[in-house]
């Protein structure tokens, strides 16, 4: 639990994204082992298939909760030390590390069942027909301007959509039963840790298999994490951490963005609530029934939508004592690389987005983030009254994206993505690339007087190439003061008070979570580009180019 923290799960996909709100807005900064990590997973769109563009998964899905030692939340002026991007707060995650002692091996595993929370109750066939008749009659009276919607009396010529015989001899199909199901979760965790006075190590591995509660939903995840700390000399130590994970998802249609297509490209859950209960599952010829332009909920089970993600990150830290335990310097390098491939195929016998047509999309994405920091720290207890801690540092942060994809139409169902060159329809190729760079200088000083009165000040200067020239840099100051009331003599005798502190702070934070295409770029439109005849090029205005 954390005061002021709100979480909302906005996807029923396994590993679905959790929106975290700390300061009234979403997307806080996540700092894992001192390195800022992406909070959102890389995502791909559905191309020209009509499927949702994003399946909403967490950027930290590759971090095993069993490897986490502690979590700290910064939500006031203390977040200003992280400067631009910290307007929505900061979440500090400290992974477990090895400790001096004999090797320790631990294992835990679990198997659990998952059931859907009681869902919306849809109308049965008789209720549906009765309400359809009521609505149809009211609509008739309104259009004819008959009572009570006009001066004319009812003419008695309205005929019900469903007769009494229809209502008494109708079948009843509960479409939710074709979409919702029970699931399960299997977890296995294994850790090994230990060390000596010179070397400490931690290794952790996990396996997770989850079957979702919506048709076609599921995932398999493998994670491996390790770190090692080495004291090379009394004045020099080195730590290294690494994490690798692989995730394989089966994506389900659960009601996300439909690309402004409305119910013609709605989810299986949406269709299950909209589909009339009096319709059977299949028609006389064995094909799925269709209702207007809404996809058959059960038919969506034949849509194949798979995602595979690979991620690994490396962190290196060197700490050198320049003068006793008073003055030291630290260097940090962190790298996180993610790759993802998503493949979609809609068979020709599935009516979706107002058509019977085989369609597919293959898309790959890659993201690389790098962190490089150098810090000088000072720590000393002076005059037997004041503990002084100060830090000054510089940082450079790089982020790059690259992706490509192709949508295709009219390929044989048995071939699907295995040979898209055999497709008889149109092809829609896409590609993109982007790079961002941020540079920072930061300073922090703290004074703890008599272990009762604390004063802290920070100053950070951030610059990013996301903004126009002349507006790339900004300062982010903060100051805070605290009174540890529980350390005063008049409260020490009260045993039921462990910590009582009064704190006030002021600070300035920023936001750069604005994407990488804020102004002009080369941007061909895949609907208009024709490689054999012509193309369209948008040239940015010269004064708006990035440096």
What annotation goes with each model-predicted range?
Residues 81-83, 101-102, 115-118, 248-251, ...:
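Switch/connector loops and helix/strand junctions flanking conserved nucleotide-binding motifs
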Residues 62, 67, 74-92, 216-229, ...:
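Conserved, well-structured beta-alpha core segment at the onset of a catalytic domain
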Residues 3, 14, 18, 28, ...:
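Residues embedded in well-ordered regular secondary structure
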Residues 37, 207-211, 460-465:
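A short, flexible beta-alpha/helix-coil linker loop
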Residues 52-62, 222, 356-363:
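Aromatic/His-enriched, Gly/Pro-containing loop or helix-boundary segments
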Residues 221, 227-236, 241-246, 254-255, ...:
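Extracellular/periplasmic, surface-exposed regions of secreted and cell-surface proteins
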Residues 1-44, 69-70, 75, 79-96:
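Extracytoplasmic beta-strand/coil segments of soluble accessory domains associated
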Residues 36, 122-123, 127-176, 268-299, ...:
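Flexible glycine-rich, low-complexity coil/linker segments exposed to the extracellular/periplasmic environment
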């Amino acid at each position: 639990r954390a005061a002021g923290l709100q979480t909302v799960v906005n996807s029923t996909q396994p590993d679905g994204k959790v929106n975290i709100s700390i300061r009234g807005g979403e997307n806080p900064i996540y700092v894992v082992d001192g390195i800022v990590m992406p909070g959102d997973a890389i995502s791909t769109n559905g191309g020209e298939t009509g499927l949702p563009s994003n399946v909403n998964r967490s950027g930290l899905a590759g971090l095993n909760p069993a490897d986490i030692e502690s979590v700290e939340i910064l939500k006031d002026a203390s977040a200003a030390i992280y400067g631009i991007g910290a307007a929505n707060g900061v979440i500090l995650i400290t992974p477990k590390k090895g400790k001096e002692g004999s090797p320790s091996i631990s294992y835990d595993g679990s198997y659990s069942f998952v059931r859907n929370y009681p869902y919306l109750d849809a109308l049965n066939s008789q209720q549906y027909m009765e309400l359809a008749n009521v609505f149809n009659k009211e609509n008739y009276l309104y259009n004819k301007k008959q009572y009570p919607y006009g001066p004319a009396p009812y003419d008695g010529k309205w005929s019900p959509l469903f007769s009494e015989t229809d209502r008494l001899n109708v079948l009843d199909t509960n479409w939710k039963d074709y979409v919702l199901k029970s699931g399960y979760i299997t977890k296995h965790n294994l850790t090994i840790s230990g060390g000596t006075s010179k070397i400490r190590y931690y290794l952790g591995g996990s396996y997770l298999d989850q079957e979702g509660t919506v048709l076609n939903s599921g995932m398999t995840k493998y994670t491996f994490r390790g770190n090692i700390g080495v004291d090379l000399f009394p004045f020099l130590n080195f730590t290294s951490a690494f994490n690798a994970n692989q995730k394989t998802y089966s994506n389900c249609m659960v009601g996300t963005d439909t690309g402004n297509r409305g119910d013609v490209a709605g989810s299986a859950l949406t269709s299950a609530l909209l589909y009339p209960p009096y319709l059977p599952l299949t028609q006389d010829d064995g094909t799925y029934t269709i209702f207007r332009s809404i996809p058959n909920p059960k038919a969506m089970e034949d849509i194949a939508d798979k995602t595979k993600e690979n991620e690994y990150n490396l962190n290196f830290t060197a700490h050198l004592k320049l003068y006793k335990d008073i003055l030291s310097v630290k260097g940090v390098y962190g790298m996180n690389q993610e790759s993802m491939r998503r493949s979609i195929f809609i068979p020709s016998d599935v009516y979706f987005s107002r058509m019977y047509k085989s369609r597919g999309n293959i898309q790959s994405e890659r993201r690389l983030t790098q962190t490089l920091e150098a810090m000088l720290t000072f720590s000393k207890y002076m005059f037997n009254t004041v503990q002084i801690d100060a830090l000054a540092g510089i940082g450079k942060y790089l982020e790059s994206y690259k992706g490509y994809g192709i949508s295709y139409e009219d390929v044989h169902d048995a071939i699907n993505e295995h040979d898209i060159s055999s497709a008889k329809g149109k092809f829609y190729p896409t590609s993109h690339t982007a790079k961002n760079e941020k540079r920072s200088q930061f300073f922090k000083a703290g004074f703890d007087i008599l272990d009762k009165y604390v004063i802290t000040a920070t100053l950070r200067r951030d610059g990013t190439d996301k903004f126009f020239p002349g507006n790339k840099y900004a300062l982010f100051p903060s100051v805070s003061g605290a009174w540890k009331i529980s350390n005063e003599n008049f409260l020490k005798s009260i045993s039921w008070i462990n910590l009582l502190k009064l704190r006030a702070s002021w600070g300035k934070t920023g936001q750069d979570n604005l994407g990488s295409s804020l102004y002009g770029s080369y941007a061909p439109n895949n609907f208009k580009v024709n490689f054999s005849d012509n193309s369209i090029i948008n040239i940015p205005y010269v004064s708006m180019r990035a440096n």
